[in-house]
């Protein structure tokens, strides 16, 4: 019995040394970065500057980064190894967009120069079905943007400023498949703003009155689908060529508002070309 008391601590100490330090296993953050360029026709109406519809072409740059965590269990298995990594059910997506367009009315006696930058922060829950071939996502996003619209013909009030903030539910579906030996995926995503704020001058109000004299006239307007029905949707196809993933798709962006007795819309139909890059950022959990 006394001999057992001497052997037992030695055995326990050996077992503790053999167990892996699971608490120090790396925690990875998987990032999918997509850089896209879009080009296509656009249609702009802004009754503050002109009652005419202006048609032209738009060029848009999009940088999108989707992040989700991959965690490792801290409980060792019977083989002395930690359990396999588990992917988080939540993703965070950051999107930067910069767009410029050049358009003309039917009379072709004037031009619109349009520029806009927007930033989108989205959070989504995702589900995997059909043996991980189908991925569904749903969540919400916040978007902030600012830009300008300049009419080359107008002498008074030649430009219009754009600034907005909105919150929107979003959803997407992605299906993975193979074309012979080529890996591919088709994806659809959409967002529909429900609540936001928008800067707009009032009907007949000049920017001189607003900024030089400080005459505020309901220039910050709350927006809903009733006075600013807006939709952004994208259908894309990803395909792998060796170790590289490319994207081709369609982006439809329909921004519109009717506030302060003024009408505004910017419709874009863009062909999207992009490159998809996936990588992991490792962290050591203390």
Question: What do these predicted ranges mean?
Answer:
Residues 44-51, 62, 103-111, 154-160, ...:
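Extracellular loop and loop/strand-boundary signature of outer-membrane beta-barrel proteins
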Residues 23-93, 286:
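Short glycine/proline- and aromatic-enriched beta-strand/turn motifs that initiate or cap beta-hairpins
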Residues 39-45, 96-104, 142-150, 175-177, ...:
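Transmembrane beta-strands of outer-membrane beta-barrel pores
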Residues 29-35, 71-77, 86-94, 132-140, ...:
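Outer-envelope beta-barrel architecture signal
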């Amino acid at each position: 019995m006394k001999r057992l008391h001497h052997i037992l601590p030695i055995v326990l100490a050996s077992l503790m040394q053999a167990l892996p330090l699971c608490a120090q296993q790396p925690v990875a953050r998987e990032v999918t970065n997509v850089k896209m360029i879009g080009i296509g026709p656009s249609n702009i109406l802004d009754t503050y500057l002109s009652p005419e519809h202006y048609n032209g072409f738009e060029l848009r740059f999009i940088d999108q980064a989707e992040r989700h965590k991959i965690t490792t269990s801290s409980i060792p298995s019977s083989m002395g190894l930690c359990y396999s990594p588990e992917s988080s059910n939540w993703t965070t997506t950051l999107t930067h967009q910069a767009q410029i367009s050049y358009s003309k009315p039917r009379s072709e006696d004037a031009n619109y120069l349009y520029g806009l930058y927007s930033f989108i922060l989205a959070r989504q829950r995702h589900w995997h079905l059909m043996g991980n071939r189908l991925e569904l996502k749903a969540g919400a996003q916040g978007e902030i943007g600012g830009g300008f619209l300049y009419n080359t013909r107008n002498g008074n009030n030649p430009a219009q400023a754009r600034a907005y903030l909105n919150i929107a539910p979003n959803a997407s579906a992605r299906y993975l498949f193979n074309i012979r030996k080529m890996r591919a995926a088709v994806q659809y995503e959409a967002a529909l703003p429900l609540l936001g704020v928008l800067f707009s001058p009032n009907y007949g109000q000049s920017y001189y009155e607003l900024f030089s004299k400080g005459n505020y006239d309901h220039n910050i307007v709350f927006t809903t689908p009733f006075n600013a029905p807006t939709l952004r949707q994208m259908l894309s196809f990803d395909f792998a060529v060796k170790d590289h993933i490319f994207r081709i798709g369609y982006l439809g962006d329909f921004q519109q508002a009717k506030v302060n007795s003024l009408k505004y819309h910017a419709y874009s139909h863009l062909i999207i070309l992009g490159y998809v890059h996936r990588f992991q950022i490792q962290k050591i959990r203390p």
